[in-house]
Every structure is written in structure tokens, then in C-alpha cells.
């Protein structure tokens, strides 16, 4: 057998289904303990760098004890990231796994809040409020969302939990920053960096609308993201992969994401991406679909050049209750899409 990889013990039927994950992950220590409640000892050890491997004997451990009520702490990891946490626990007093509650938040308020109700945090899609059990000599990853702060509650009554470390797990695509921005204003430089970083977090295998939201490929929202990607990261494969995905998921005469305006955005993005990359073979692979949406959109223009789309007339959420604004916006997007298609077929 010539295969020298881990897959050498698997049969071909299994290896044919392998989908590699091109993303990387790194561990980050908490920067500070924002708040604690109840009986918790030696919590400062959680801020120290230690071997990321659990051992048999506990030493210099952080102990959460719920004998006199729930024990809780709130950690700050310093920056918003995409991923979860990894808890290394030496032992729990239940011998079956102590019940804990873990809440992720972009802010202290979100991590401390209950889900639901007016003004409170949600717990939709990428779950940020999780109940689980932590057992002895364990080192498990928990959660996959966007966060900076994490609150951990020991909900098991009359129990104790011995912890070695709690690290954040940053999951990201290792894409080099090819573009840059610099000016005399440090704040403006920081704003540019944070904007690029925010888009980078959403460049996973596909381009997501938000790391802590529904994680769908919203092709209309992809337009500003694609502009940022080509400026900062160049011709990243996540753009073409996302466009391929949404095309395959939307057989004609369907509208992408259920909205005619998002199909228009698809045509605009394909044109702009081809003009930037020059990937002719990729463009040819889209040709049949582009011809189809060109015919479909052309049927939604009256003799005066007015857009007549009746389904999926969406511009953005702030204008969604303003029909006059939506009409003007969709008319403009339709014009841009028609012009993009015209240029592609010239």
C-alpha cells in the first residue's frame, strides 16, 4: 500500500466522501475575568498559559463550587472571534458530569442576558446559550458562534468542578492580507482594519452573512463583502464557491434566496468578479444560468423600461416598509443587473 496518510486504513468508498476543511484553529487565553459569583477559588490561574492537555492529577486548579449556590464567572477574550471554547476539567464531584451553562456574547450584556423577550439576546441559528455536562479528565470543545465574552455557570447543585484551563478556539481561513490602508488618522486606520477583520471572520468555506447568525449564503449581502475581499484578500476561492453554491441551490425560474433582487445582485457580482479575476473558464461555466436569468429578468420590464417584478421585491431592512423607496431601489438594481448581463454577452 503506497498511501502514507491517515486514510490508508479506510476503503475507497469512504475516502471518496472525504471533504477537507481548509480552515485552521488556534487557542486563545482569556485576557481578564470580568465578573464572578459564588464560591470560586484560584480563578486567576485561567489567565495563565498552560499545556493544553489534561492530566491525571489536579494541581493549581480553579475550583467552582455550588454548595452555597450557583458558581459563575465571566471571561473576556479580548477580541471578537469565530469559534467556541475548550474546557479542560480535571474532575467533578458527581462522577457523571456536572451540569453547566455556557453563554457566549459579543458584549458583556449579551453574555449575561437570558434569551427571548423584548431587548434580550436571541439563541437562534448559531447557538450562543448552551447547557451541557463537564466530566472528569475531559477536554471538549463547546460552541460555534461569534463572541468575545463567555459566561460559565455551574448549575449542578452541591457540586464542585476542578478546571485546568478555558481557552477560546478561533476557527478561521488562513488568507493573507494582500491589500492595506494607511493614513495619518490612527482611528481611521483601526476602522479599516476592523472592517477587513469582520469580513475575514465571515470568509469560512463559504461567505456567510454573519458568524453568529443563520450562516446562509445571502447573495445580495455578498456584494459589499466581495468588494472588500477583492480589495484585501484578492481572488479568494470562497467567492466563486459561494456563487456556485447559490446557483446550484436555485434552479430557474426560482429567485435566489427567494428574492428577485438577489438574483439581480448575483448577475452584478458575477460580472464584477470576472472583470477583476479574468477567470474565463469559470465565467463560461455560468453561461447557461446567466442566459436563463437574463431572459427571466427581461420578462419583468415593461415597454417603458419599468421594473415589474412582483416576487421578492427587497432592497434592505430599513426601507422594507417604504414601498416607494423599495420600488426605486429595485429599479436601480435591475438596471445595474441588466447592464452587467449586457456587458457579459457582448
Task: Tell where the protein language model's regions lie, with residue ranges.
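Amphipathic, well-ordered alpha-helical segments in soluble domains
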Residues: 221, 235-238, 242, 262-269, ...
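Extended, well-ordered alpha-helical scaffold segments
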Residues: 191-194, 235-246, 280-297, 341, ...
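Extracellular/oxidizing-compartment recognition motifs
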Residues: 1-205, 220-221, 234-243, 281, ...
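The feature captures the catalytic groove of carbohydrate-active enzymes
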Residues: 113-119, 123-125, 249-265, 280, ...
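C-terminal catalytic domain of Rieske-type non-heme iron oxygenases
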Residues: 219-222, 246-249, 315
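Short glycine/serine- and small hydrophobic-enriched flexible loop segments
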Residues: 227-231, 268-275, 336-346
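Alpha-helix capping and helix-loop boundary segments enriched in small/acidic/polar residues
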Residues: 138-141, 182-186, 213-216, 230, ...
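Charged, long alpha-helical assembly modules
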Residues: 257, 261-281, 289-292
Amino acid at each position: 500500500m503506497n498511501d502514507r496518510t491517515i486514510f490508508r486504513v479506510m476503503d475507497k468508498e469512504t475516502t471518496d466522501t472525504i471533504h477537507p476543511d481548509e480552515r485552521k484553529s488556534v487557542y486563545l487565553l482569556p485576557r481578564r475575568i470580568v465578573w464572578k459569583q459564588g464560591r470560586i477559588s484560584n480563578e486567576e490561574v485561567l489567565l495563565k498559559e498552560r499545556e493544553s492537555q489534561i492530566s491525571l492529577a489536579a494541581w493549581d486548579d480553579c475550583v467552582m463550587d455550588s454548595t452555597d449556590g450557583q458558581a459563575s464567572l465571566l471571561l473576556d477574550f479580548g477580541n471578537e472571534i469565530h469559534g467556541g471554547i475548550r474546557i479542560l476539567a480535571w474532575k467533578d464531584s458527581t462522577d457523571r458530569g456536572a451540569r453547566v451553562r455556557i453563554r457566549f456574547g459579543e458584549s458583556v450584556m449579551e453574555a449575561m442576558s437570558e434569551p427571548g423577550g423584548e431587548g434580550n439576546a436571541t439563541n437562534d441559528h448559531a447557538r450562543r446559550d448552551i447547557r451541557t455536562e463537564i466530566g472528569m479528565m475531559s477536554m471538549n470543545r463547546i460552541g460555534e458562534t461569534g463572541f468575545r465574552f463567555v459566561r460559565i455557570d455551574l448549575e449542578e447543585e452541591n457540586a464542585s468542578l476542578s478546571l485546568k484551563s478555558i481557552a477560546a478556539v478561533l476557527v478561521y481561513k488562513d488568507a493573507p492580507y494582500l491589500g492595506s490602508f494607511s493614513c495619518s488618522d490612527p482611528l481611521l486606520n483601526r476602522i479599516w482594519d476592523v472592517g477587513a477583520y469582520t469580513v475575514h471572520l465571515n470568509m469560512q468555506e463559504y461567505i456567510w452573512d454573519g458568524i453568529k447568525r443563520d450562516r446562509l449564503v445571502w447573495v445580495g449581502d455578498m456584494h459589499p463583502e466581495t468588494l472588500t475581499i477583492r480589495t484585501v484578500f484578492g481572488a479568494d476561492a470562497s467567492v466563486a464557491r459561494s456563487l456556485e453554491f447559490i446557483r446550484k441551490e436555485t434552479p430557474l425560474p426560482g429567485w435566489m434566496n427567494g428574492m428577485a433582487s438577489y438574483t439581480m445582485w448575483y448577475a452584478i457580482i458575477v460580472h464584477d468578479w470576472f472583470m477583476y479575476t479574468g477567470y474565463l473558464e469559470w465565467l463560461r461555466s455560468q453561461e447557461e444560468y446567466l442566459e436563463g436569468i437574463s431572459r427571466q429578468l427581461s420578462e419583468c420590464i415593461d415597454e417603458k423600461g419599468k421594473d415589474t417584478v412582483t416576487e421578492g421585491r427587497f432592497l434592505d431592512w430599513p426601507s422594507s416598509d417604504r414601498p416607494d423607496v423599495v420600488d426605486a431601489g429595485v429599479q436601480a438594481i435591475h438596471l445595474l443587473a441588466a447592464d452587467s448581463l449586457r456587458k457579459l454577452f457582448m
